[in-house]
Amino acid sequence: MKATVDAGAFFKALNRVIPLLKVSAIPALSEASIQFRDGVCTITATDLELWVQTNIPAEGDDFGVVLSGTKSIAKAGKFFRGPLTFSCADAAVSSPQITMACADKSAEFTGYPLKDYPELPRFTCEQAYTANAAQLLICIGRIKYAAQRRSDSRPVMSGVRFYRQQLYCVDGQRLAVCANDAMTVDKTFVVPADAMWILKAFGDQNVSVQVGTRYVCFAAEGLCAYVRRLETCDTLTPEAAIPRSERESYVVDRKEFLQRLTYLKECASPVKTTPVVYFENGCLSLQTPSAWYRAAIELPGRSEVAFAFNLSYMWDALQQFSGHEKVRLHVLSPVSPVTITAEGTDDVALVLPVRYRAAA
């Protein structure tokens, strides 16, 4: 069996799926598969949560194999030009012998049969949208700090929610919302935040966003990424979490706030894993076993509501507004979430307060 593709197109396509490949207890999952069928070469990589496929034109017989040493093969690709031929005497045996040849260069290796590679689950589109991949990636990059790491007990907390004209992450202690005016979602869906790096593969292209029962497919120009959906919790919405009223709000200098938090973070006891900062009328204070450390930020007037917060959580929330000089803090009470906004953006950050002992 023999099939031929253009070397440049093949290795460009292979390099688009390689970032997904990781060391796996199942050897075949550490590699990419190639399948020639009906004049098309399909290259696939998966970690069983995320699937990436890309297609290029091909000529020759129909067969498929799983590569061995995929990353090394990709490195060799920079020396190949013109027609690239893959040949295999019997692709169905347990250790198929594969020859890759291009002009005066060739490589021989032992691969895996395609039956050892998991099949892409059937996909039926239920919702379809169009969005710019680069804009989605920027938006998710601003808010993914509020997603938990993967957890078997609360997987939904590790996701990015596509909700109406918003994307948001929530982990139970904080909420980060990014406006997504270019895409209005009819029915909320959630995908793992740590899988959204795959959008980099699309560059600045507009992508088709197809939502199925179990997967969401992002596709453009021969590249498809299937991301496993997480369960949806309809009660965890921005409307339900963000306070509808406030007792006071004030504008602060974002960089100044971050500088004061940096100082307090350096002063925190090394054994205190979650330093808590007490905020009262512009004064930030942090208690360690040996001392109280204080720093002040400028407020436009007097603040009446004192509250405390996790230093790291507030730090992350302020970083969400990295393009803004000023941010506005909205406060209702010492036990209500602190909401952060900025002029010129519909982004919202929310940080839950923590219990505190007032400074002496």
Report the location of each language-model feature.
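Structural preference for solvent-exposed beta-strand-turn elements
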Residues: 1-360
